[in-house]
């Protein structure tokens, strides 16, 4: 009986030593993977602000939502670049139509084509 208990004790000690050396047993619980908080910390508020979980109900706002862009006032300098480009294109087109109607573009057709610097050097 003493021989059996000694063999059992030896096998338990061997198993404990092997599991500790192989890294199968860890003394502290390790946290792994991404959580919403860690993603928000690393990616910034814009990445997390657009996140909605399945538990969100329509019509209710959360604390983490971004400020809506409806607060922008007309004529403010916060306009996006494509909107400014569209407005600039429309203004240039209307200016072109006004010059064409006034006859200012007819005089430009009578002028010779502008020569490049290479053409001037050759002649």
Swiss-Prot record:
Glycoprotein listed as a keyword: no
Record-stated family: Belongs to the galanin family.
Pfam families in the record: Galanin, GMAP
Locations listed in the record: Secreted
Sequence ranges of Basic and acidic residues compositional bias: 62-73
Record: disease: Epilepsy, familial temporal lobe, 8: A focal form of epilepsy characterized by recurrent seizures that arise from foci within the temporal lobe. Seizures are usually accompanied by sensory symptoms, most often auditory in nature.
GO cellular component assignments: extracellular region; extracellular space; neuronal cell body; secretory granule
Protein task: Endocrine hormone of the central and peripheral nervous systems that binds and activates the G protein-coupled receptors GALR1, GALR2, and GALR3. This small neuropeptide may regulate diverse physiologic functions including contraction of smooth muscle of the gastrointestinal and genitourinary tract, growth hormone and insulin release and adrenal secretion.
Highest taxon in the source lineage: Eukaryota
Record GO biological process: feeding behavior; insulin secretion; negative regulation of lymphocyte proliferation; nervous system development; neuropeptide signaling pathway; parental behavior; positive regulation of apoptotic process; positive regulation of cortisol secretion
Modified residues (Phosphoserine): 116-117
Alphabetical keyword list: Cleavage on pair of basic residues, Disease variant, Epilepsy, Hormone, Neuropeptide, Phosphoprotein, Secreted, Signal
Name of the protein in its database record: Galanin peptides
One GO MF term: type 3 galanin receptor binding
Signal peptide residue numbers: 1-19
Keyword Ubl conjugation in annotation: no
Organism per entry: Homo sapiens
Location of region: Disordered: 46-80
Annotated propeptide span(s): 20-30
């Amino acid at each position: 009986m003493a021989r059996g208990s000694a063999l059992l004790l030896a096998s338990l000690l061997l198993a404990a030593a092997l599991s500790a050396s192989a890294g199968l047993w860890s003394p502290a619980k390790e946290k792994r993977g991404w959580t919403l908080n860690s993603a928000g910390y690393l990616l910034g508020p814009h990445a997390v602000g657009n996140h909605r979980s399945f538990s969100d109900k329509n019509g209710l706002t959360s604390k983490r939502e971004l400020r809506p862009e409806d607060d922008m006032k007309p004529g403010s300098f916060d306009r996006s670049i494509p909107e400014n480009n569209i407005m600039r294109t429309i203004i240039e087109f209307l200016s072109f139509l006004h010059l064409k109607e006034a006859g200012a573009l007819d005089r430009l057709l009578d002028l010779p084509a502008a020569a490049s610097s290479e053409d001037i050097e050759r002649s």
